[in-house]
């Protein structure tokens, strides 16, 4: 059964929000930011890529000829609709419904950045031999620490509209690249099969 790209987009939106709220309700503790990051980095790309593939494949199965444009559209439109609706909904939820969750994510983001800085500093200090290099490293570390003082992190917000726009721009690149791949792949296979039939 071939679903329209817009229908698949709505289904992707629903799947994204289910994952978002599962993480929100069951993992909104000390690991909330890390688990959210992993879900966005590993789970959602697989779901979106799978949906895009299924969208193009089912269309290809039901049509003798599939142009690059058709294949690209069948892959891109569902991901775009699902992504836009998800970004808007998550932004609205964190900024207007549960601002405490937003504060927690921002706090854990800063904490994670500080932890990574400490790890880099510790590992770098172990391998340095010359006192001059160690002193330079210590100085740079102290300078970087200033960005984590209470005054520096007060009001720091990584979940503003501009940040969400940036996130979506990065996601959009993923959608375009994946759609280009599916467009080229299915168009090539169609031409190849038609050539074989003519022979």
PLM regions and their residue ranges:
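Hydrophobic secretory-pathway targeting helix
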Residues: 59-95
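Alpha-helical transmembrane segments of multipass membrane proteins
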Residues: 15-23, 48, 82-90, 174, ...
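Alpha-helical transmembrane segments of multi-pass membrane proteins
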Residues: 7-11, 15, 73-82, 166
């Amino acid at each position: 059964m071939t679903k329209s790209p817009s229908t698949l987009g709505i289904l992707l939106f629903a799947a994204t929000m289910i994952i978002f709220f599962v993480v929100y309700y069951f993992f909104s503790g000390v690991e909330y930011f890390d688990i959210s990051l992993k879900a966005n980095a590993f789970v959602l790309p697989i779901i979106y890529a799978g949906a895009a593939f299924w969208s193009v494949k089912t269309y290809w199965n039901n049509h003798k000829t599939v142009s690059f444009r058709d294949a690209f559209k069948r892959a891109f439109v569902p991901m775009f609709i699902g992504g836009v609706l998800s970004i808007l909904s998550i932004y609205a939820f964190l900024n207007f419904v549960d601002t405490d969750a937003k504060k927690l994510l921002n706090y854990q983001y800063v904490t994670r950045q500080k932890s990574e800085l400490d790890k880099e500093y510790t590992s770098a200090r172990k391998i340095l031999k010359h006192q001059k290099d160690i002193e330079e490293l210590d100085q740079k570390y102290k300078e970087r620490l200033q960005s984590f003082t209470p005054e520096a992190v007060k009001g720091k917000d990584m979940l503003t509209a501009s940040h969400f726009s940036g996130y979506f721009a990065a996601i959009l690149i993923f959608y375009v690249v994946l759609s280009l791949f599916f467009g080229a792949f299915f168009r090539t296979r169609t031409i190849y099969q038609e050539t074989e039939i003519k022979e």
